[in-house]
């Protein structure tokens, strides 16, 4: 009877040991799967953030270009600034004024 008890305890112990090892491996596999899912989600978020940064960068460049047009003559100017750049075009009052100056200059010679 004693040998039967020993063998029964031995089988029970080995069965519980293998069961605990299997459960531990299962938990590790589940944690790995969760980590992979989390990494995939974070990669998707990173991809969306990169795309959003790209779109914002393009939008800001477009905004800068419209602002630069106000200040750079080769890109075009606002009509208020054109009056200060004679080669870009003059307002009608300035055209009249320059004609008068030209006539006065001819008379002075």
Curated annotation (Swiss-Prot):
Biased composition (Acidic residues): 30-42
Main location: secreted
Keyword Cell wall biogenesis/degradation tagged: no
Keyword Acetylation set for record: no
Residues covered by region (Disordered): 27-46
Signal peptide start and end residues: 1-22
BP GO terms, sorted: defense response to Gram-positive bacterium
Modified residues (Methionine amide): 75, 88
Subcellular location: Secreted
Tissue: Expressed by the skin glands.
Propeptide regions on this chain: 23-46, 66-70, 79-83, 92-96, 108
Keywords, alphabetical: Amidation, Amphibian defense peptide, Antibiotic, Antimicrobial, Secreted, Signal
Location of Leucine amide modifications: 62
A GO cellular component annotation in the UniProt record: extracellular region
Disulfide bond annotation, renumbered to this chain: none
Function noted in UniProt: Fallaxidin-2.1 shows no antibacterial activity against Gram-positive or Gram-negative bacteria. Does not inhibit the formation of NO by neuronal nitric oxide synthase. Has no effect on splenocyte proliferation or smooth muscle contraction.
Family: Belongs to the frog skin active peptide (FSAP) family. Brevinin subfamily.
Name of the molecule in the record: Preprofallaxidin-8
Organism field: Litoria fallax
